[in-house]
Every structure is written in C-alpha cells, then in structure tokens.
Swiss-Prot record:
This is Serine/threonine-protein phosphatase PGAM5, mitochondrial. GO terms for molecular function: protein serine/threonine phosphatase activity. Keywords: Acetylation, Hydrolase, Membrane, Mitochondrion, Mitochondrion inner membrane, Mitochondrion outer membrane, Necrosis, Phosphoprotein, Transmembrane, Transmembrane helix. The lineage of its organism: Eukaryota, Metazoa, Chordata, Craniata, Vertebrata. Pfam families: His_Phos_1. The N-terminal 35 amino acids, including the potential transmembrane alpha-helix, function as a non-cleaved mitochondrial targeting sequence that targets the protein to the cytosolic side of the outer mitochondrial membrane. It comes from Homo sapiens.
Length: 289
C-alpha cells in the first residue's frame, strides 16, 4: 500500500513538473495590458535550459564544455583510476583564448518595404569604412568574419572586409535580427507578437550556443573572430555570455558600426573588454538607428 502511494506521489510530481515547463514556455511573449511600469515576474523561456544559478553564482559549465562534464565517469576503468581520469581531463581541456568581436551593422534605410530594400545609407557606408579601419588598426590576425544574412549586415561586411584582406566570410541565418526574449522591464513602443519571441528566441539562443563557447581543445593558438549582426542579437549574446539576466538585453544600447569585444578564457571565464565602442568615429558620424 505504501509503495502504491509513493508511486502516486511521484506521478503527481512529474505531472507538476511538466505543467511548470509548459507554463514557462507559454509565458514567453504573453501579451499584457498596462504600461511600462507594470510589474511582472521574469519567466525564462523553456528553450533556455535548466534553472539558473542563484544571484552572483557563476556557472563554470555554462557552455557544457567543462572537461569533467565531457567524460563518462561511469565507464572509467577501475584499475587505471585517477591516472586515466587525469589523462582524459587533459585531452578535453581548452588551451586557447577566443576573442569575439561583435559588430553592429551600419545605419540603413529603415523605410524599405522589403528586407532587400533596407540598404545602407551613405552615412552608413562611411560608418562601415571607419569600423573597418579601426579593426585593421588593431593589428590582429583575424580568423574569420561570420555575418548575418540580412542585407544591411551583408553590405556592412563587404565594406569592412576590404580592410581585412584574406579573412574568410561566412553567412548565417542564425544571426538575423529578431526578438530574443521578452524584455524586462517591458516597454510600450516595441511589442512583437508572442509567436515572434517563440520563433526568434530559439534561433538566437541557437546562435549563442553555436558561436559563443570556450575554444575547442584542439585549438592551439588564440583566435580573433568577427561577428557582424544586429543590436538585439548582440545585446542578448552579451547578457547570456556574462550570465546576466537575458531579459535585461533591452537595457543596453548600441550605436551603428559599434564594436563589442568579448573574451572567453580556456577555463570558461568570460570578460567584456568593450561594449558598443564607437570612440573611433567623429561625433557627427554616430547614430543608433
């Protein structure tokens, strides 16, 4: 009898957990009445993974590349013991530092009826030239340029890449602009439909997981990688990389053509060197839209 009651309790617990996951998934992008000041609890989307660490607690395995997490300890040979474990840990341990340069596209024509019509303005082309010159002046050996497949990002990339000859370019849909997660606090001037958070959020999170992580264990030298994309994507990535609440992304502001520099150490520690730097541009060339 006691065993049957235990099974019933366990079943209730599982059902409750499923309901909680379902609720959190539905809560993303849920329309609300009221103005900017309306309080609400922040609900992480279901695709964001498990429970977050407590405030101020750093998750060392945030990218799921902590060496110990890559080893199946249950398959460890009992006879070889700690020696074999140490060897495997060394095999999976990162050695290099990754430098991630996140570039926001330059100013573009916002009134284009189609995405392909939203090309860079003359000022936007000047901004891209200035950003390219700034990157070239750093004297770094850039490994690659990954860019969004949207027109304004492609045009920004084409101009910047002229200042970085020989650096390969890769286009991806993952970095396209979108609504990553419902912002907190909410704002009245920007309210996408719930389905947009559902579709864009998972894609932008996939971009973060695909591109933002510690170096592969086989990488011997530090790398310098450029990602040319959009304000929402960059702000979300910065919050996720620093393990700040991702729903706070809209509290940050980025100028067109700005440079954000993230550093990912071999031990998984992340540092933000610069956020939205446009100090290399004359004041009359700086815009945010």
């Amino acid at each position: 009898m006691a065993f049957r009651q235990a099974l019933q309790l366990a079943a209730c617990g599982l059902a409750g957990g499923s309901a909680a996951v379902l609720f959190s998934a539905v809560a993303v992008g849920k329309p609300r009445a009221g103005g900017d000041a309306e309080p609400r609890p922040a609900e992480p989307p279901a695709w964001a993974g498990g429970a977050r660490p407590g405030p101020g607690v750093w998750d060392p395995n945030w990218d799921r590349r902590e060496p110990l997490s890559l080893i199946n300890v249950r398959k460890r040979n009992v006879e070889s013991g700690e020696e074999e474990l140490a060897s495997k840990l060394d095999h999976y341990k990162a050695k290099a530092t990754r430098h991630i340069f996140l570039i926001r596209h330059s100013q573009y024509h916002v009134d284009g009826s189609l995405e392909k019509d939203r090309t860079l303005t003359p000022l936007g082309r000047e901004q891209a030239e200035l950003t390219g010159l700034r990157l070239a002046s750093l004297g770094l050996k850039f490994n690659k340029i990954v860019h969004s497949s949207m027109t304004r990002a492609i045009e920004t990339t084409d101009i910047i890449s002229r200042h970085l000859p020989g650096v390969c370019k890769v286009s991806t849909d993952l970095l396209r602009e979108g609504a990553p997660i419902e912002p907190d606090p909410p704002v009245s001037h920007w309210k996408p439909e719930a389905v947009q958070y559902y579709e864009d959020g998972a894609r932008i999170e996939a971009a973060f997981r695909n591109y933002i992580h510690r170096a592969d264990a086989r990488q011997e030298e530090d790398s310098y990688e450029i990602f040319i994309c959009h304000a929402n994507v960059i702000r979300y990535i910065v919050c996720r990389a620093l393990q700040f609440p991702p729903e706070g992304w809209l509290r940050l502001s980025l100028n067109n053509g700005s440079i954000t520099h993230l550093v990912i150490r071999p031990n998984g520690r992340v540092a933000l060197r610069t956020l939205g730097d446009t100090g290399f541009m004359p004041p009359d060339k700086i815009t945010r839209s």
